[in-house]
């Protein structure tokens, strides 16, 4: 049986023999695209979850919310505490943390468009009452924070540290603005093996970041900055899958991307996707670290 045979059938129901022949010939291809442990539809979201996950974008959104909730649980912020969100993105995690804990959050970002989106979250008609009194956003450079010493009880940085041209400076600034004993929760990539120059270039362009370093280099910089490492979690499986999904969605939404950003964006990005994907899959680690400022 060929694909042409399947297409020619139209709406005619297949015979058991034809179904068997289809799986004999194309079962391995289905396993490559659907999953190989059972060859049935997977439960990508818990039963009854609302809103339901209906496509890959929704699945990616769900994964991001799960990550945010895990970080909120890990930082364990009390209602009276004040957290600095270093590299706050579009504000979703800051708002989610404030809603769940009742704590105050100050977010900083170097992207003006993302800061505009942050403000929209605070003024949206469905924004929780009092949210704008507990959450604020401002333009700010992580390597030169515009805050007084010991201004915050805690800080977190979700996928921002990889962007920094001087990571040690960013770590020292985070320590400076924390009260004695304050905790800093952050994510960071690390280099696992030896990628090709093409793979390194693709990753650094896609992420707008300097080349990654081995994990041991990060540990050394944390010690130089003066932090005490409290816990390290290896989250590499999540980053590898994120890279895979990003590449799939890029191909799936090419038409939308071209319409919104132009053919030039595709021409720039197309040659990066394959080496970016292999870099994420084969050469990168992803860690979640909880560190603390020294006690007074």
Located regions from the model:
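N-terminal auxiliary segments of SAM/dcSAM-dependent transferases
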Residues: 1-35
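Conserved alpha-helix/loop element of class I SAM-dependent methyltransferases that forms part
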Residues: 43-50, 61-79
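Class I SAM-dependent methyltransferase SAM/SAH-binding core
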Residues: 82-84, 93-144
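A short acidic, Gly/Pro-enriched loop at the edge of an enzyme's catalytic core
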Residues: 143-154
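A short glycine-rich, Lys/Arg-flanked "PGG" loop and its adjoining helix->strand segment in the class I
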Residues: 168-183
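Short, glycine-/aromatic-enriched active-site segment of Class I SAM-dependent methyltransferases
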Residues: 186-210
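Short alpha-helix
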Residues: 210-226
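Conserved Class I S-adenosyl-L-methionine
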Residues: 231-296
């Amino acid at each position: 049986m060929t694909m042409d045979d399947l297409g020619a059938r139209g709406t005619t129901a297949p015979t058991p023999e034809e179904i068997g022949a289809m799986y004999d010939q194309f079962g391995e291809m289905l396993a490559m695209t659907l999953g190989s442990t059972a060859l049935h539809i997977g439960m990508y979201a818990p039963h009854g979850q609302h809103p339901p996950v209906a496509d890959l974008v929704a699945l990616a959104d769900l994964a991001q919310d799960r990550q945010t909730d895990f970080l909120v649980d890990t930082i364990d912020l009390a209602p009276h505490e004040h957290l600095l969100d270093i590299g706050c993105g579009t504000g979703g995690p800051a708002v989610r943390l404030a809603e769940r804990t009742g704590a105050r959050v100050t977010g900083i970002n170097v992207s003006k468009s993302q800061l505009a989106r942050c403000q929209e979250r605070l003024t949206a008609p469905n924004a929780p009452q009092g949210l704008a009194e507990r959450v604020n956003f401002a333009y700010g450079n992580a390597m030169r924070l515009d805050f007084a010493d010991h201004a915050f009880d805690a800080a977190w940085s979700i996928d921002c540290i990889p962007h920094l041209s001087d990571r040690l400076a960013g770590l020292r600034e985070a320590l400076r603005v924390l009260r004695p004993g304050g905790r800093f929760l952050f994510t960071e990539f690390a280099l696992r093996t030896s990628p090709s120059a093409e793979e390194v270039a693709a990753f650094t362009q896609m992420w707008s970041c300097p080349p990654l370093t081995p994990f041991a280099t990060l540990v050394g910089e944390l010690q130089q900055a003066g932090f005490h490492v409290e816990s390290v979690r290896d989250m590499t499986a999540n980053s590898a899958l994120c890279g895979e999904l990003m590449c799939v969605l890029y191909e799936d939404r090419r038409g939308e991307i071209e319409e919104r950003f132009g053919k030039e964006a595709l021409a720039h990005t197309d040659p990066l996707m394959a080496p970016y994907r292999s870099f994420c899959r084969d050469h990168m680690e992803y860690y979640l670290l909880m560190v603390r400022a020294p006690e007074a």
